[in-house]
Amino acid sequence: VQVRVDGLAPGTIYYYRFTNADGERSELGRTRTTPEPGAERVRLAVVSGSSIYSGYFNAYGRIAERTDVDALVHLGDYLYDFVDDEERVRVPMPEPVVPDDVAGWRGRHAYYLTDPNLRAARASLPWVMIWDNHDLEQREADFGGGVQAFREWNAITPPVSVDAPEIAYRRVRFGSLLDLLITDVLLFREESLVPGSDEASILGATQYAWLTSQISASDSAWRVIGSQKIVAPIEGSLALLGGSTWDAFEASRAQLFGFLADGGHDDNLFISGDAHITLASDLPDPRPGATPYSATTGAGSIGVELMPGSVSRGNVDESVNGSQTLVNAIDRGARAANPQFAFVDLVRHGYGLLDVTAERIVAELWYSPILEPSDTEELGGTLEVQRGANHWQRPAPMEPTE
């Protein structure tokens, strides 16, 4: 059931429920409208990689308990099409099969909502969502029914055309503090047969034009740009993550970074998902002749990126059979090869929290266990980017915002 409601006041909490023809009522839901210009603060939860089979959704439970978050941004892999036997922590019955049509995807969405923490999070605050490769079948006609089911089961702005339901990139404006620009780097890629070709595009020409026009027209203090995949360059021990990220589209990244740098478009924070690890990175301008990047001063960075750890999907430790020795070696290698990284965590799961004011954004990284139900969480790190700086402050502060 989806209902579009007009005439709501900005920056206001509303409660809602649904009643069917037989008088049966749904659980009570709570939402919050976006603020009007002049709001002094916005807080966003950021998540991705929520596999019901790989662990418990304790992170969702902790988000649901918060009353200080304006919206949740889910950057894809909201659900998973298959059960990974190497991560089989729990499999609610009945045993699922891989969806291959719209009915199968509808069933998978219903299956996920058997989880009480997910239901609580969905009922406690508004969600801004985009799909990724496990939410649909990108190579099948009509995306295997995945796009249709995703739209039916989630609150997404209606498509610009009934003939293009796959178009879900959009802007959500939070007063005059930030423009949330949700991109889709999955379904509009323009591939090339030549690796590294300048003709390849991760956004596609139409979406790139939309994104750059939104950035140019924005008069908000910040732009928070959602990307399902990692934006930052990755070298060394984590380079294998780059196969489906912006690393595979270097010309696209250079084009966008050049647009930001040459146009004087400061104060952009990219949020990303998919890779399951936690990563905070400066974004060096890769173009020849650009200001050389300095990890000490942040010079040469055109913005910053935050990728919180997955809600539950397997991390580096799961992929190396829990070997802490290997995890430590990969961690050291990643940090040594990537001076732009301000924070790395390869094993923990949870969510990110962005605390946005006109002068700075503080990113908090919250972690919860996944192997059993738990009502605990811990603050694993905080980072700060100052207005006009375009790089993460170092050393990072280590106190939660209040």
Residue ranges with predicted function:
Residues 1-402:
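Metal-dependent phosphoester/phosphodiester hydrolase catalytic core
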